């Protein structure tokens, strides 16, 4: 026997390897392809919606932080002039610990931040 046709005691048959190609219904194959493309587009749409929402929420967070920074800058400028802002006095005296910073944030928004953050 020829060494190329014998491996491990088994005789190889000449011919094609693997599964025999079945007669594939071309219409069914085309429909599966279309369905797969539809699903792919739907997944892509969901992914982009998620990313847009994520960007939007991050932009809102950035605006809120800019507003807070502006508020603190105003407080620092007032203290540099020797004035103590009423909000800081309220915080130091313990009056409305939760209400004072929120009120100041709204005032800071009305000054310069409307132009920067939509």
UniProtKB/Swiss-Prot annotation:
Where is it predominantly found?
A: nucleus
What's the family? Belongs to the bZIP family. ATF subfamily.
Q: Segment Basic motif: which positions? A: 29-60
Residue ranges of every copy of the bZIP domain listed in the record: 23-86
> What protein am I looking at?
cAMP-responsive element-binding protein-like 2
Q: Where is this region: Leucine-zipper?
A: 62-69
Keywords, alphabetical? Activator, Differentiation, DNA-binding, Nucleus, Transcription, Transcription regulation
Job of this protein: Probable regulator of creb1 transcriptional activity which is involved in adipose cells differentiation. May also play a regulatory role in the cell cycle.
User: Which domain of life does the protein's organism represent?
Assistant: Eukaryota
For this protein, what is any one GO molecular function term?
A: DNA-binding transcription factor activity
GO CC, sorted alphabetically, is: nucleus
Where are the stretches annotated Disordered? 1-25
Specify residue ranges for compositional bias: Basic residues: 10-21
Q: Name one GO biological process term.
A: positive regulation of D-glucose import
Q: Where in the cell is it found?
A: Nucleus
């Amino acid at each position: 026997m020829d060494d190329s046709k014998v491996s491990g005691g088994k005789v190889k048959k000449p011919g094609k390897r693997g599964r025999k190609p079945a007669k594939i219904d071309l219409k069914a194959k085309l429909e599966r392809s279309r369905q797969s493309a539809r699903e792919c587009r739907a997944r892509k749409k969901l992914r982009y919606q998620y990313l847009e929402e994520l960007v939007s929420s991050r932009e809102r967070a950035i605006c809120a932080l800019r507003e807070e920074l502006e508020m603190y800058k105003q407080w620092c400028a007032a203290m540099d002039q020797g004035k103590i802002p009423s909000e800081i006095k309220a915080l130091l005296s313990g009056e409305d610990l939760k209400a004072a910073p929120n009120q100041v944030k709204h005032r800071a928004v009305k000054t310069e931040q409307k132009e920067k953050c939509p």
